[in-house]
Amino acid sequence: MVNTGEIKNLEAIDIVKLLSVLPHRYPFLLIDRIIEIDGDRKAIGIKNVTVNEPHFVGHFPENPVMPGVLILEAMAQTAGAISLLALGRGKEDLVYLMTIDNAKFRKPVVPGDQMRIHVQLLKKRSEVRRFLCIAEVEGTRVSEAEISAMVVKS
């Protein structure tokens, strides 16, 4: 069988596979697994939010809330991972965030939450991709944004 570089309907991508694809590491690796994937068209990533994460020391000590910018980064990492996987590329290549549009934060994400990050490809042109991203906790939308990113060979 010829490898086209396209991944279709994989059941899950665990943390070991994510570490082989993404260059991010603790404390900036913000997805724990991808539970559903359909090539670079759509995926659902998981972020298990724990009180041990360093940003909770200062955001906010008495009432910890995951910073919105880190929710956006988790979305970008999920989109980046499926882009690299679909192209058959790994952490030697990079995905650069280009734009964030229409970002909305509807509810706080707190320690103990499991955030599901839905990403859907809206447009693809050469190495540039645009995704609709929706983050949910227990089925409730907590954030959404459209992001554009570029896959770059290192």
Curated annotation (Swiss-Prot):
One of its GO terms (biological process) is lipid A biosynthetic process. Keywords: Cytoplasm, Lipid A biosynthesis, Lipid biosynthesis, Lipid metabolism, Lyase. Its EC number is 4.2.1.59. It is found in: Cytoplasm. CDD domains: FabZ. It is an enzyme of class 4 (lyase). InterPro entries: FabA_FabZ, FabZ, HotDog_dom_sf. It holds the Pfam family FabA. Coiled coil: none annotated. GO terms for cellular component: cytoplasm; membrane. Involved in unsaturated fatty acids biosynthesis. Catalyzes the dehydration of short chain beta-hydroxyacyl-ACPs and long chain saturated and unsaturated beta-hydroxyacyl-ACPs. Belongs to the thioester dehydratase family. FabZ subfamily. This is 3-hydroxyacyl-[acyl-carrier-protein] dehydratase FabZ. The lineage of its organism: Bacteria, Pseudomonadati, Pseudomonadota, Alphaproteobacteria, Hyphomicrobiales. The gene is fabZ.
